[in-house]
Curated annotation (Swiss-Prot):
InterPro entries listed in its UniProt record: CRISPR-assoc_prot_Cas5, CRISPR-assoc_prot_Cas5_HALMA, CRISPR-assoc_prot_Cas5_N
One annotated Gene Ontology cellular component of this protein: cytoplasm
NCBIfam families: cas_Cas5h, CRISPR_cas5
Localization annotation: Cytoplasm
Quaternary structure and interacting proteins, as annotated: Component of the Cascade-like complex (Cascade I-B), composed of Cas5, Cas6, Cas7 and crRNA.
Listed name of the protein: CRISPR-associated protein Cas5
The keyword NADP belongs to this UniProt entry's keyword annotation: no
A biological-process GO annotation: defense response to virus
Main subcellular location of this protein, as a coarse class: cytoplasm
UniProt source species: Haloferax volcanii (strain ATCC 29605 / DSM 3757 / JCM 8879 / NBRC 14742 / NCIMB 2012 / VKM B-1768 / DS2) (Halobacterium volcanii)
Pfam families found in the cross-reference section: Cas_Cas5d
Length: 265
């Protein structure tokens, strides 16, 4: 049975698992020359990864991860460290020079692109050894049951990855039927997950560096593709051992999941 999600975005129970990889890259929206990465996987990226696990068709699962019928919390488990990796790109413009082989009724005609030129060197900013704890709840019972079965059995229809298909991910420490317990904010509260607030709402701490991002959160299907309908602003701590501290005036609903305090969004 799928969990109910209340008006504050808190589910009655959820699935929890850890996802990690050697590398990760979540391309920032609006960047073209340098391939910069988000430090935290966007909510839409997590949705795509879970859809790959259950084998959902492209553009078919956006309603499952809507703003009101899904809840996701993301907790960094590793320090958010990046490196730049140069890669050589090869253009695919069909107007570029090509070479054709001779063909006849018994043979195929093959077309080869002239690869002696039109190469570009791109620098990819990638996360090194990223690891995240994901808590997820979905009201779509069929999808949720299939996801739970795959996670528990360690199977997937398509291999999960962290951003790029070559950055294959490992999923471990799966827990089911986790019941979040609502936490009261007594002056301040430390949150382990990323928190959907502005930087001005985070309480400063000595020797703790906060980061902020704005990334796609919810998408809808449209003819010929998809469209982002919501972006999330959130705060995270650069070091995995440090929490984000919030005050009692902060408009979020923190919950306890195991030994972690998280905020669903």
């Amino acid at each position: 049975m799928s969990p109910h999600i209340d008006a504050n975005g808190v589910p009655i129970d959820c699935l929890s698992f850890t996802v990690r990889s050697t590398w990760g890259h979540f391309k920032r929206v609006g960047r073209s020359v340098t391939k910069q990465t988000y430090r935290i996987p966007p909510r839409t990226t997590v949705a795509g990864m879970l859809a790959a696990i259950v084998g959902a068709d492209r553009d078919s699962y956006y309603d499952v991860f809507g703003a009101d019928n899904s809840a996701i919390a993301i907790t960094p488990l590793s320090d958010l460290r990046t490196v730049n990796i140069p890669t050589t790109g090869l253009g695919t413009d069909p107007k570029q020079d090509v070479t054709e082989t001779a063909g006849s009724w018994r043979t195929y005609k093959l077309t080869y692109q002239n690869t002696t030129g039109d190469r570009q060197l791109h620098s990819y900013e990638v996360l090194a050894d990223p690891a995240y704890r994901i808590d997820v709840a979905l009201e779509n019972e069929e999808f949720y049951d299939s996801l739970r079965e795959h996670l528990v059995n360690g199977t997937s229809i398509y291999p999960p990855s962290l951003g790029k298909s070559e950055y294959l991910a490992v999923i471990e420490d799966v827990e089911v039927d986790r019941e979040p317990e609502v936490q009261d904010i007594d002056e301040t509260l430390d949150i382990d997950s990323v928190v959907p607030i502005s930087l001005s709402e985070a309480v400063p701490q000595g020797k703790v560096t906060y980061g902020v991002e704005r990334s796609p959160a919810v998408m809808v299907r449209e003819s010929g593709g998809r469209r982002t309908t919501r972006f999330d602003d959130y705060v995270y701590a650069q070091q995995a051992s440090n929490p984000v501290r919030i005050g009692e005036q902060t408009d979020v609903a923190p919950v306890q999941v195991g030994d972690r305090t998280v905020v669903f969004r």
